């Protein structure tokens, strides 16, 4: 019980989520814009608390692990949630959505991701996964009266339920084979008893469940439709934060519980990475809707992150952590630009972005440089992230995988530049007006743009933080 202070971040997040629900019921409709500000300020305060605990370590309640690895991801989730809240102000009002419920679900999804990232035990890991999934199911269908949003919610519920069942069955097989639900103890049991057929089957099922959450091929089919139909800010949050949470849990399970099966599962990860990188990039080329293009781009980015898992090293885990943080600003930047455009023109079609640079230089610049960062073009921050990912697999002699990743990154430049071509070389429609962007969204956009440049030119502070956190994860 003495270690309960280590749960400060989670307790504050839960309190904020419940408080926002209460405010949604108590605050008059005309004053509900204030709920958005409370959510953003609350997340900022929790972010400060998480940063202050970045070196804290300990185990709470027998299986909940507080360590620099988990805290790094909590900081990532909070940053993503703040950016999502900032770009939701106008969107939520325009769509007539319930602000209290919307921001409460956003915060509770963040709580689920925190639990997922710090779980050192299978039951709490599953509970965190379900809290995250259920809140995202509601958020995906939150745009009432919109058929695509309803379709997105239904697809996410049905396919999410199926993946959760597969994942839970895998957990039960691993528990039956090891006799414990504590991740470190599972690793000790596997090292002592060896691999049984049930354990290998459970490993495959767990990997399939994680693959659904990170949108790895062939478990990706839900993401383009869900991303297109969900509210745009939610799509950005879903594509970034939930993926990072799944990777955090994936590292804990496969590196903590199943390291002795590395020679077995690494082949599965290689196959997933290759399929995900290739299909994600190739299918993105013909897309005409910006959210679908970013959905397939997000699939490809998951493939690059899988390369860090394949390397099975401190460098690989550190590279995953570093790239995941950059991915927040790159992908969220693109979705913030898409949100600003949708708030004004009500369209997500790339052809309608024609002449955007003349209507809003800031929105066009954020979209352009976010996409260039995702492509890994220097001096953007994404270049440094991909450099570390490729170096991690080259150090393990997977040179062909690095070459494939570089070639597919070159392919991604093509479809990203199709968006840039429309924005900078196209002509805006006659009578079109300059885009009106809310002050809060403008601040978030400028911050994202600056961070993409700063971390591309001077990445040392974040690389050191990510690598040091990865080192502590491998300590006994």
Curated annotation (Swiss-Prot):
User: Biological process GO terms, please?
Assistant: ATP synthesis coupled electron transport
A single Gene Ontology MF term assigned here is: NADH dehydrogenase (ubiquinone) activity
Q: What UniProt keywords apply to this chain's record, in alphabetical order?
A: Cell membrane, Membrane, NAD, Quinone, Translocase, Transmembrane, Transmembrane helix, Transport
Name the Enzyme Commission number(s) assigned to this protein: 7.1.1.-
Has keyword Protein transport? Answer: no
Instruction: List the catalysed reactions.
Output: a quinone + NADH + 5 H(+)(in) = a quinol + NAD(+) + 4 H(+)(out)
Q: Where in the cell is it found?
A: Cell membrane
Does this UniProt record's set of keywords contain Membrane? Answer: yes
According to its UniProt record, this protein's enzyme class is: translocase
Q: InterPro entries given for it?
A: NADH-Q_OxRdtase_suN/2, ND/Mrp_TM
Major localization listed first in the record, in broad terms: membrane
Top-level taxon of origin: Bacteria
Homology family? Belongs to the complex I subunit 2 family.
Subunit notes for this chain? NDH-1 is composed of 14 different subunits. Subunits NuoA, H, J, K, L, M, N constitute the membrane sector of the complex.
Q: Which PANTHER family match?
A: NADH DEHYDROGENASE
Protein name as catalogued: NADH-quinone oxidoreductase subunit N
Q: From which source organism is this entry? A: Moorella thermoacetica (strain ATCC 39073 / JCM 9320)
List the taxonomic lineage: Bacteria, Bacillati, Bacillota, Clostridia, Moorellales
């Amino acid at each position: 019980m003495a270690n309960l202070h280590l749960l400060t971040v989670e307790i504050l997040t839960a309190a904020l989520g419940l408080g926002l629900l209460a405010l949604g019921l108590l605050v008059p409709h005309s004053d509900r814009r204030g709920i958005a500000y409370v959510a953003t300020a609350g997340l900022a305060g929790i972010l400060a608390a998480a940063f202050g605990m970045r070196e804290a370590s300990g185990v709470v309640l027998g299986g909940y692990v507080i360590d620099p690895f988990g805290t790094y991801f909590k900081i990532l989730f909070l940053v993503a949630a703040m950016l999502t809240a900032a770009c939701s102000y106008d969107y939520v009002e325009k769509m007539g959505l319930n602000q209290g419920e919307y921001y409460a679900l956003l915060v509770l999804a963040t709580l689920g991701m925190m639990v997922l990232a710090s779980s050192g035990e299978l039951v709490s890991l599953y509970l965190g996964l379900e809290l995250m999934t259920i809140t995202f199911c509601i958020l995906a269908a939150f745009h009432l009266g919109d058929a695509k949003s309803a379709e997105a919610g239904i697809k996410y519920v049905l396919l999410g339920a199926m993946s959760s069942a597969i994942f839970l069955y895998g957990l039960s097989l691993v528990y039956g084979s090891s006799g414990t639900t504590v991740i470190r103890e599972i690793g000790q049991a596997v090292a002592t008893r060896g691999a049984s057929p049930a354990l290998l089957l459970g490993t495959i099922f767990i990997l399939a469940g994680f693959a659904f959450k990170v949108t790895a091929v062939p478990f990706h089919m839900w993401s383009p439709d869900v991303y297109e139909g969900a509210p745009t800010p939610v799509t950005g949050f879903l594509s970034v934060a939930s993926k990072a949470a799944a990777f955090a849990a994936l590292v804990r399970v496969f590196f903590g519980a199943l390291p002795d099966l590395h020679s077995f599962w690494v082949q599965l990860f290689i196959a997933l990475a290759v399929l995900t990188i290739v299909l994600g990039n190739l299918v993105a080329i013909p897309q005409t809707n910006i959210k679908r293009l970013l959905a397939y781009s997000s699939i490809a980015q998951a493939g690059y992150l899988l390369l860090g898992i394949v390397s099975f090293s401190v460098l690989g885990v550190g590279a995953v952590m570093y790239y995941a943080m950059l991915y927040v600003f790159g992908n969220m930047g693109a979705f913030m630009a898409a949100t600003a455009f949708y708030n004004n023109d009500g369209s997500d079609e790339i052809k309608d972005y024609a002449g955007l640079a003349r209507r809003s230089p800031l929105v066009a610049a954020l979209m352009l440089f976010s996409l260039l960062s995702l492509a890994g073009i220097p001096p953007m921050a994404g270049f440094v992230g991909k450099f570390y990912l490729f170096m991690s697999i080259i150090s393990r002699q997977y040179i062909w995988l690095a070459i494939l990743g570089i070639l597919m990154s070159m392919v991604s430049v093509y479809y990203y530049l199709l968006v840039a071509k429309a924005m900078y070389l196209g002509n805006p429609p006659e009578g079109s007006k300059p885009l009106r962007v809310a002050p809060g969204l403008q601040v978030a956009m400028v911050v994202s743009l600056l961070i993409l440049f700063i971390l591309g030119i001077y990445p040392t502070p974040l690389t050191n933080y990510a690598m040091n956190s990865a080192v502590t994860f491998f300590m006994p």
